[in-house]
Amino acid sequence: MIDSVSYPSLPVPLANATGAMDDNCIYIAGGQETMVNEQSTHHFYMLDLMHKERGWQEMPDWNGPSLSYAVGVAQGERFYLFSGRSYAPDEAMVEHTEGYVFEPGIGKWSKMIGSFPVMAGTGIPYGEDKILLFGGVEEILPTSSEHPGFSRKLRVVSTSTNSLVDSLEWPYRIPVTTNVVSVGNQVFIVSGEVQPGIRTPFILKGSF
């Protein structure tokens, strides 16, 4: 038997957004409202699961470009937003590598130190003060059979210093446009794109 729970609808339709859950709050950031005349956004919403009747609350957006295909992670009662790209019907697409952190207690964003080229990648909290960022698109290259695939890097971010502290090279291709799930000391990345337009049926598993 499968149980289902109803949640409030988002204020606007969104695709290619990112999100994360911290305690009882779900955060959704960026994305685009339509697949016609595509345009990235500054949307930032929060749903308090203890007060679902209030619906999604519009939160202050980050002081930076509009974003889609960003990576969102919650850690230590904060929401972190990495990389992504901006675009509009009359503007060229621009890839971004900045990182931002939102502190719900004061309702403000701050910019992080360094560069995080992880567009369309995945991320999870690790321990009490770390974030793991898996893969991503470091550079947008022409789509062809010669495409090398996406980043194989595992990046480690310290939430104490709000900066990148380490990076490792994985022996396997890390998919993008998918999700990562942690179970105990293991992480799973299911399917996703390993080259533009090519999705994999495989599941990557890592242990820490």
Label the predicted regions:
Residues M1-F208:
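Kelch-like beta-propeller repeat domains
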